[in-house]
Amino acid sequence: MTLRLLFLALSFFSVQVTENKILVKQSPLLVVDNNEVSLSCRYSYNLLAKEFRASLYKGVNSDVEVCVGNGNFTYQPQFRPNVGFNCDGNFDNETVTFRLWNLDVNHTDIYFCKIEVMYPPPYLDNEKSNGTIIHIKEKHLCHAQTSPKLFWPLVVVAGVLLCYGLLVTVTLCIIWTNSRRNRLLQSDYMNMTPRRLGPTRKHYQPYAPARDFAAYRP
């Protein structure tokens, strides 16, 4: 009898724990290429005729509230993003979907869904799920498209500058060669001209009158 009562008590307690918690399932990983993602959170609870709150949190400890929406099945909830995020959402009887856009690599993190039953009492929320890692890839497409456009003009400019530099170099070499040749020719011409070492003195013989030897003949 005692064992039977204990078993009934444990069964009742387990049912109460299950009923007081909402189970939420999420995809373990989402890879984002276009800066936009939709995260679906499946819950195991009938939210019909209940006022509920659906929230999305960022971080291992759910420190940052990304987006939140309140509503019921009578009217669509209005989702409000937190600062630094852009979000919207919708829900049905099994799933709440959060749509995020304008994401960048800094938004890469783990995200958790939270479902709360606000009314009627008692208050219920979900057990923390395993979360979803959202990985936002860096965009390299724009660089890949613009690189060829910038590459060829740079090649043309570099080619023009190279040709101009070669032309200037060749011109300067020709001018320098001609100038050197002219200097060598002028130097050779100057070497062929006789040089006068200085004024020359004329040596004059002393004057002696000529003798007439015929006058002395007999």
UniProtKB/Swiss-Prot annotation:
Domain Ig-like V-type: 29-138
Phosphoserine modification, residue list: S187
Positions glycosylated per UniProt: N72, N93, N106, N130
Localization (cell): Cell membrane
Major localisation: membrane
PTM text: Phosphorylated by LCK. Dephosphorylated by PTPN11.
Cysteines engaged in disulfide bonds, as pairs: C41-C113, C67-C87
Residue positions, PTM Phosphotyrosine: Y189, Y207
Species, as recorded: Rattus norvegicus (Rat)
Membrane side Extracellular: residue ranges: 20-150
Subunit structure: Homodimer; disulfide-linked. Interacts with DUSP14. Binds to CD80/B7-1 and CD86/B7-2/B70. Interacts with GRB2. Interacts with PIK3R1. Interacts with PRKCQ.
Highest rank taxon of the organism: Eukaryota
Any Gene Ontology biological process: transcription by RNA polymerase II
Membrane topology, from the record: Single-pass type I membrane protein
Cytoplasmic side: 178-218
InterPro entries: CD28, CTLA4/CD28, Ig-like_dom_sf, Ig-like_fold, Ig_V-set
Name of the protein in question: T-cell-specific surface glycoprotein CD28
Signal peptide (residue range): 1-19
Transmembrane domains' residue ranges: 151-177
